[in-house]
């Protein structure tokens, strides 16, 4: 029996992207996590859309569990760039975020600061 460790779903996804490979994702707007589970073997990642859909924290958590069961990263498109949108999603277990309507380097830095804990950021 070998004791090899598999890369995390996020590390595998990043490596695939860094290698220039095509990554196929599924946009999730439905609240039922069965959608994520059903698509799990056919995609490289999920992006759960909170910008254009309403979803409870419980539904979001169900999608995270389904993605984790399929060893796929779950990215969340938040409705805005502020800490109140970003922090709860990261605290709930998102593997990454997609932030819409970012138009400047200063806005990008604000988003990064919202994602990182002090002293590198302001996430609390």
Positions of predicted regions on the chain:
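N-terminal amphipathic alpha-helix/helix-capping segment at the start of soluble metabolic enzymes
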Residues: 1-25, 29
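Short, acidic/polar
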Residues: 28-40, 80-88
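Glycine-enriched alpha-helix->loop->beta-strand junction motifs that scaffold or abut catalytic
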Residues: 42-46, 91-96, 116-117
């Amino acid at each position: 029996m070998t004791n090899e460790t598999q890369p995390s779903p996020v590390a595998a996804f990043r490596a695939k992207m860094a290698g220039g490979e095509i990554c196929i994702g599924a946009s999730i707007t439905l609240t039922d996590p069965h959608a994520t589970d059903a698509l799990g073997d056919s995609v490289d990642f999920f992006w759960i859309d909170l910008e254009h859909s309403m979803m409870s924290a419980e539904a979001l958590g169900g999608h995270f569990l389904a993605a984790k069961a399929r060893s796929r990263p779950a990215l969340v498109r938040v409705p805005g760039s502020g800490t109140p949108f970003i922090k709860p999603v990261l605290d709930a277990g998102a593997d990454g975020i997609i932030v819409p309507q970012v138009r400047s380097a200063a806005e990008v830095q604000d988003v990064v600061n919202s994602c990182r804990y002090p002293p590198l950021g302001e996430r609390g």
